[in-house]
From Swiss-Prot:
It is an enzyme of class 3 (hydrolase). Zn(2+) binds at residues 53, 56, 146. The lineage of its organism: Bacteria, Pseudomonadati, Pseudomonadota, Gammaproteobacteria, Enterobacterales. This is Succinylglutamate desuccinylase. Its EC number is 3.5.1.96. It catalyses: N-succinyl-L-glutamate + H2O = L-glutamate + succinate. Transforms N(2)-succinylglutamate into succinate and glutamate. One of its GO terms (molecular function) is zinc ion binding.
Length: 327
């Protein structure tokens, strides 16, 4: 049976583009895209994606091993499954992206960027998702796996897209079982892959940040054992593992820090970790005509990056929220 990651990195097409084993039918759609359907039927349709940023290799390796186990018959499949390796060209180059950040392009936002391989791929992925979920009566899920650029005080966390409906109890149970440290609830629509599948496909979706970006072959996948066990259980229809970590913390985005001037200043050191706590009154950022000081007793910073282009988000300010916010 073929190796999806090896084929994708080599830019090759499998000798056979569809097949089956005792448990499932599989179909290679195009580069980095594989669909699998269980023979006994299913109640869930699941998208598992990684590599939207090409240098975030650990989740790619994790998904590739899951695909191998399913194709080799070492693990049963109980859901209809679409596996997405998001940005093959950037994966081959070992870079986050080649031209522009694909995870800002979904929901048709690729039209706002100069044409590139990434805009074409984002458009292609939107079409593939639409076709995968078309006329699908089963419950829909999407887990988009990433690793972070910087260190994090809470190293494993999920980001839930903004939506007006309650978040899926089944999805939240999986995220709990995956031993995530925190969940962050977005307060506005965005261009992420998970927001697209939530808004346009009605899927229960989450972006998962699972450690730091490292080159292929040097990841310690044991660090990802909890999320791996949870995803394995989900695709195989097995009971979820019991949570072993401390209680999951819930945050919501209070404010996005938008860089409107080249004079924008973020008053944090370059090595400030995600989820660093900030005390009330602290001057966090300023630019001509605008400054932001911490408003609540405590706020937390996520994805600080003052080097972004004008008009883009240079960080997010979080406040802690009760779990009831999810329902």
């Amino acid at each position: 049976m073929f190796d999806l990651l090896a084929l994708t990195l080599a830019g090759q097409v499998p000798a056979e583009q569809q097949g089956e084993n005792a448990n499932l039918h599989w179909r290679w759609l195009t580069e980095g895209l594989l669909e699998m359907t269980p023979k006994p039927g299913y109640r869930q349709a699941v998208v598992l994606s990684a590599g939207i940023h090409g240098n975030e290799t650990a989740p790619i390796e994790l998904l590739n091993q899951l695909v191998k186990d399913l194709l080799n018959g070492d693990r049963p499949l109980a859901v209809r499954l679409l596996v997405v390796l998001g940005n093959p060209a950037a994966m081959r180059a070992g870079k986050r992206y080649l031209h522009s950040d694909m995870n800002r392009m979904f929901g048709g936002r690729y039209r706002d960027f100069d044409h590139s391989g990434e805009t074409a791929r984002a458009q292609q992925l939107e079409q593939v998702i639409a076709e995968f979920f078309a006329d699908e009566g089963a419950a829909r899920f999407h887990y988009d796996l990433h690793t972070a650029i910087r260190d994090s005080r809470l190293p494993r966390f999920g980001i839930l897209p903004f939506q007006t409906r309650p978040y899926s109890a089944e999805m939240l149970a999986l995220l709990d079982a995956a031993d995530l440290d925190a969940l962050v609830i977005h307060s506005a629509p965005g261009g992420t892959f998970s927001h697209f599948t939530s808004e346009h496909a009605g899927a229960a979706s989450c972006t998962l940040e699972l450690g730091k970006a490292r080159p292929f072959g040097v990841n310690d996948l044991q660090q990802f054992a909890a999320i791996n066990r949870a995803l394995q259980a989900a695709v195989s229809g097995e009971p979820l593992p019991l949570r072993s970590g401390s209680e999951l913390r819930i945050f919501r985005v209070e404010r996005s820090l938008i860089k409107r001037s080249e004079e924008f200043r973020l008053h944090l050191s370059d090595d400030t970790a995600n989820f660093t706590e900030l005390k009330q009154g602290t001057l966090l950022c300023d630019q001509p005509g605008e400054e932001y000081r911490v408003q609540h007793v405590s706020e937390w910073i996520l994805f600080p990056n003052p080097g972004v282009a004008l008009g883009l988000r240079a960080g997010m300010v979080l406040v802690e929220a009760p779990r009831s916010t999810l329902y």
